[in-house]
Amino acid sequence: MLKIEKSSEIKRENGVLMSKCTANVPGSPMSVYSFNVDGILIDTGSSSLLEEFKPYFNEADFDAIYITHFHEDHIGNVAYLQNQRDVPAFIHSSSTSFTPKPFRIPTYRQIVWGESAPFSSTALDETFTSRNHTWEVIETPGHTKDHVTFYNRDLGAMFTGDLFVSPKVKVVLTEENILDTRRSLQKIEAYDFEDMYCCHAGYVKNAKEWIRLKIEYIDELEGKVLTLSKQGKDIYEITAELFPKPYPIIAVSNTEWSPVHMVRTILNRG
């Protein structure tokens, strides 16, 4: 049986209360964040880390939950919080029909993140108002089709879910579209903000510099893939040349996570 040690920490940056909880999978610690600001909770972490998140949930002051996308490490504790506080949860309109149903995921994801109980949800509008601020809901597909980013102009902050994660991503989910991710990064880059709150990287200062690095990385990757394709190499040869490292998650997930999905998207040109 895989032993997973867990840890948590709570901190505050620029008026944003946040909790980082980690599932320490051997050789690959996996962290996820939840954010609390101006009476709203942004993403709820995974059900497997509920006990670690509870001190933060107890400290957090919120009247509503806003979800960046329908994945188990973001929706995992919505049902618990609704049972505790009877608060509404808002998510992309394409996902509201799924939230009242059991969410089935592969076994390896169940082991790390746990299963998510059904919950009630309401479709996001283009904007919403918290206690003191008006927020913009920005469509940012790529990681998932339903992915959104929450922008607070007053705070100069973007809450980006899983849009950023890291500047040089090596593996992605089979459903991801790396070219849509680039378009979404370019979209938010045009906004006026300084800070980014990422559900896996946490609080990111000088956000636009990091966003630009990821855009340039995808540009470079696209160029390399297309060059190798013109040389007659197929998708698997290209993947092996550009990503020779056998990341454990590839085998563990039976290639649900793999660099081949980025290469395929580029060859199909999005």
Predicted regions and their residues:
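Accessory terminal helices/loops
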Residues: 1-3, 190-191, 195, 204-270
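Active-site neighborhood of phospho(di)ester-bond hydrolases with catalytic His/Asp-centered motifs
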Residues: 42-45, 63-71, 89-93, 139-142, ...
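Residue-level signal for the nucleotide or nucleotide-sugar donor/cofactor binding architecture
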Residues: 76, 135, 176
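Metallo-beta-lactamase
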Residues: 2, 10-13, 94-141, 144-224, ...
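Short, basic, glycine/proline-bearing loop/turn elements
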Residues: 39, 132-133, 167-171
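Active-site HxH/HxHxD metal-binding segment of metal-dependent hydrolases
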Residues: 51-130, 216
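Conserved beta-strand hairpin/beta-sheet module of binuclear metal-dependent hydrolase folds
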Residues: 2-60, 149-161
